[in-house]
Amino acid sequence: MSNSDLEANMRKSVEATQRNFNTIRTGRANPSLLDRINVEYYGADTPLKSLASLSTPDSQTIAVQPFDMGSLALIEKAIATSDLGFTPNNDGKIIRINVPPLTEERRKEFCKLAAKYSEEGKVALRSVRRDAIDKIKKQEKEGDLSEDQSRDEQDQVQKTTDRFIAELEKHLADKEVEILKV
């Protein structure tokens, strides 16, 4: 595995963790909070963002405007039954979701969830590292690399892994500050 492949795979892991962070509620309304909501539409689970446009008219409200007005009630039901704890307000054309301020207890829960997502990201990074080191060891065993070259490449893989883990930890710290900010 070349260094650019290694970095690309690790970058994907960090980006996936970042997307998970974006689904965690902070005190502000954000359309990405609804990213994981699927709507039962014509017998198929369809992502909400493919059925409606999502916007934030102000810092405490998310507006959901369906492309097909026939899906309005289905979207409202999907939001109401999600585990996000939102109560959708349907005015016949647009669904408005008021995002209430977070309690201190809820903020701590979201910090724990962010830490869990960060740990999952680190596990993914370590998996990429393990695959890269296994390939290096295989090349050494086959005689394509000397023992010194193998050790140097393994050290380089470890340094790259450490850099990406530090980046993940920075993203986690930033998210925790964002969550805890009142």
Swiss-Prot record:
Cellular compartments per GO CC: cytoplasm
Cited Pfam families: RRF
Domain of life, per lineage: Bacteria
Compartments where located: Cytoplasm
Single GO molecular function: ribosomal large subunit binding
Example of a GO biological process term: translational termination
Keywords associated with the record: Cytoplasm, Protein biosynthesis
Region (Disordered) residue spans: 136-158
Disulfide bonds: none
Free-text function comment from the UniProt entry: Responsible for the release of ribosomes from messenger RNA at the termination of protein biosynthesis. May increase the efficiency of translation by recycling ribosomes from one round of translation to another.
Assigned protein family: Belongs to the RRF family.
Annotated protein name in UniProt: Ribosome-recycling factor
Record gene name: frr
